[in-house]
Amino acid sequence: MGSYKIAVLPGDGVGPEVVAESVKVLLALEKPFPKLRLLLSDHAVGAKCYQDTGTDLPDETLEACKTTDAVLFGSAGDPNIRFADGTEIAPQLTLRFVLDLYAGIRPIKRYPGVSPLLAADPPIDYVIMRENTEGLYASRGAGVRVGDEVAIDSMVITRKGTERIVRYAFELADQRDGAPRDGKKRVTCVDKANILKSQAFFREIYNS
């Protein structure tokens, strides 16, 4: 099965606690899979790192993320520690752009034996996929503010960015089982195409 390097970035807030438990789960995989070796290395990132060193994403951390097989990222940011322009520390956005992590994939599934949040207890199994590098994210660091009256961020939607996230969504849907209720495989486009030209462009590409 081989060895895999994982850069571990605990970060701020609940990050260290959540990552510590996640590491336990990952390392537990080595027992049932004796040929698997996970080589974990910890790296600094986040608001506390920025406060201590002047950077929220040290070069050493970035290089580690570029050369590993995976990155285990906790959380980053502190409302009391901000950049000079008032925005919060968000090294995860830098990683998105540098590593071109364009697909935000968030699976939602209800497992048997887990107390349901809904009284009806319906079967739940779907994935939310979001484009991670375009839209308003493309305006990060480039917005305009005029005194205390106006602030502007531009939304950017490109054909390349849209085509690849749409393609990824359909490929993922094809790999998964269908919806729990009827077994059908679906991809639903959620946008504001009825109002925004950029979103209408996104929908046009999706429909093509």
Model segments located where?
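Glycine-rich phosphate/diphosphate-binding loop of Rossmann-like nucleotide-binding domains
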Residues: A7-K24, A28-F33, D148-S208
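N-terminal glycine-rich phosphate/adenylate-binding segment common to multiple enzyme folds
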Residues: Y50-M155
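Acidic/polar N-terminal loop/beta-strand segments that form early-domain functional surfaces
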Residues: L9-G11, H43-V45, F73-A76
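Short, well-ordered coil/turn elements that cap or connect secondary structure elements
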Residues: M1, F33-K35, D100, D121, ...
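Extreme N-terminal starter segment of soluble prokaryotic enzymes
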Residues: G2-I6
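Glycine-rich beta-alpha junction loops
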Residues: A44-G46, N132-T133, D191-I195
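N-terminal beta-loop-helix "entrance" segment that forms/cooperates
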Residues: K35-D59
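General small-molecule cofactor/ligand-binding pocket signal
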Residues: L39-H43, R106, T188
